[in-house]
């Protein structure tokens, strides 16, 4: 950060000195033009026109250093954000709240999207399409060993290139775009050409240019009067206004949105210049191809064409150029020609950069956690084994890490324990790390090996007034969904917290026994947390397929303490009555 701040100070100094030089040159050029006006073109050129040319060059340098200043400010900002994120303040990053879906198989239960979510912790995307790609990976994790391993390779490769990742992010952040922009750009790329389809309109700019310069030449030679040449010019100016409405519509609808193309061009150029090693990144790089030029050159060409069209807002220049060469129509023709050549390329390039942007987010996550490991992915037979699993969003100085061992199919872990002892946190820890493993990201564990079955959870089912749906019915719907998927032959990894919470104790117990037995017969795997200690007796019926673990609450010297360490067996201590007494609520024993 200190090095970048020094560069920023240097950029600000250059901007100041260039501003001063521009002012001196402008004043000097005007003064020289007045002084040497009567001394002929040679003196005028030397003392007035040349300073104007130098002034224009300085304007370009000024723009460069303004961009450099913004770039450096943004670089300092993102590094400060990363420092805050190391202290578990990741409020600077987009939380993806628009992706929250209460009916999703696991994202709501695991706090994947929304405020203080896993997505917000990991998300470093700088393009709208990159954010959508990253969200889609969280919404639909991979279930194939080879696909996960290829993604692991790509993430690991990018995690070692901090400069590339920061450049991709910085370039994206300098453009203030909206998610809809890329969608509308794709719509424009796939829309038919209007002007180039009409032969008369195609030849019109050339014809107007020839007629104008012919009239100017004839006027100089004295064959026709200057007023005739001027009349022709004015006529063409008026004629050009016929096309203004359609061109204005194109400019207002897509012009601002296409400004993002300069960002994509820079990001594409960076990627073209980078040597890729992993299978996925090499494949993505091959998508950035074009017919006779590089993808970055093609995108930059379109960006320049759109910027040139934007100059029509300068009425004086646009009036002169339209009258002389039908400049606006000529520019639109060039833009449509570009579209005809690259209509199928542009959406592919945008998608590719978005995907690379998403990979950079996961690579930054890996870079920020050098002690995290990439899990081993098993090809056959479900099992899940891990040592020292921790939740990524928990303070590493306070997090108590636990393991898991599901060694065969079917197999269920039943977890019992007191309130606040750590059951629900453990379920989310397993679920989040399982999800990270299945999207190819590193996990917080000493060792982890998984078979990637589809994850399904039921941890925080809620009622719905809008759908006239009770809490209990909502939970039954989720359980029915799980059963339907199993009957359809899908392989699942199931995580449930307190089954059938919305009914009475006896009914709940009976239903829980029946559900777990059904899971056994359907050959599936998972974890169930419960307060019902009798569920622990199921191990007698399925000694090879069920294992009991617990989180205990210890009462010492009239104080409640938690170790948050998972132990073998069924919980022995409960704490509800103790907590009620501590809060002054009378507990009467019969």
Predicted regions and their residues:
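Alpha-helical coupling/stalk and coiled-coil linker elements that connect catalytic or binding modules
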Residues: 1-418, 425-455, 477-478
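ATPase nucleotide-binding head domains, primarily ABC-like/P-loop NTPase cores
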Residues: 58-59, 243, 362, 368-590
